[in-house]
């Protein structure tokens, strides 16, 4: 998918990942090219790349933030390198802190600085996607278009010699985020937002495939979704990370649509619509009904609407609460029993000690050595008793 050269550590990481997952994967051309190009890096970049290749992410962060050689690197480029490092380390939460910093940092119209700033913003969008927060991903992209009206045109002209995320990958991220997070009733309105006009001019997948959903052509949509789209996503390092959950979410969105308009529907019908086996559809619908607390039951091949019964719901709740209460009471009984045993043991120990002291007082007076010896023993016993309490 990538046209140009990948950021070298990412190319290596991507190569390692796909080699471990797909036995027939061949080393990427970008990786071979970069292994030669990297020798011409500045000294600081060679050092940083070396640390990233060794997965020394914490050291890389310290190096970017504090090494003297980084003082000549612009603020947005340093920020870009920091965000890249956190993403390579899958430390997505740390990236969120950069949003407020970028929003308060002034920028100039200098091309290199603007390019680094745009990539920082795109990396933040990528980060929301990798966190699985697709609606946030869309919101950030729309806001970025509002802030930079010619954003898509600028993205197309960004340098191609150090790519961390390609334009195509970013456009697909926006597309799948919209498809899974925008309600079906609002999808047509979203696609026709004025802010997205330039996006559609350069990338028409969202408009084209979204129209299939809007027109209820689900079989045609899922034929593309489970074939061309799946194949594409599984060849992309970032899209592949979220594809399984995204694909399942898209299907559950369709199930919810049908359950909303029907009181009885066949699993085999849904299986045909989404293009996967009945077994998988049954599992996913069962999960959807359970997690969303929907009033449906599955009987063989039929999904049937079950009218809400307050009495039955109350009985189920009381039964659940009774089980929970019984478990807690049983736990308290065990704790009380254990406490009673400990108290009885301590009482017996103290009684025995008192009896020994009483017996000793009736005997002949002790000399000085016996007194000190007994005192040491008593002290040890008292200390042990304190710890046992």
From Swiss-Prot:
The keyword Transmembrane does not apply. GO terms for cellular component: COP9 signalosome; cytoplasm; proteasome regulatory particle, lid subcomplex. Signal peptide: none annotated. Residues 143-312 form the PCI domain. Keywords: Cytoplasm, Nucleus, Signalosome. InterPro entries: PCI_dom, WH_DNA-bd_sf. The keyword Nucleus applies. It is found in: Cytoplasm; Nucleus. Component of a COP9 signalosome-like (CSN) complex. Component of the COP9 signalosome (CSN) complex that acts as an regulator of the ubiquitin (Ubl) conjugation pathway by mediating the deneddylation of the cullin subunit of SCF-type E3 ubiquitin-protein ligase complexes The CSN complex is involved in the regulation of the mating pheromone response. PCI8 may also be involved in transcriptional and translational control. This is COP9 signalosome complex subunit 11. It comes from Kluyveromyces lactis (strain ATCC 8585 / CBS 2359 / DSM 70799 / NBRC 1267 / NRRL Y-1140 / WM37) (Yeast). The gene is PCI8.
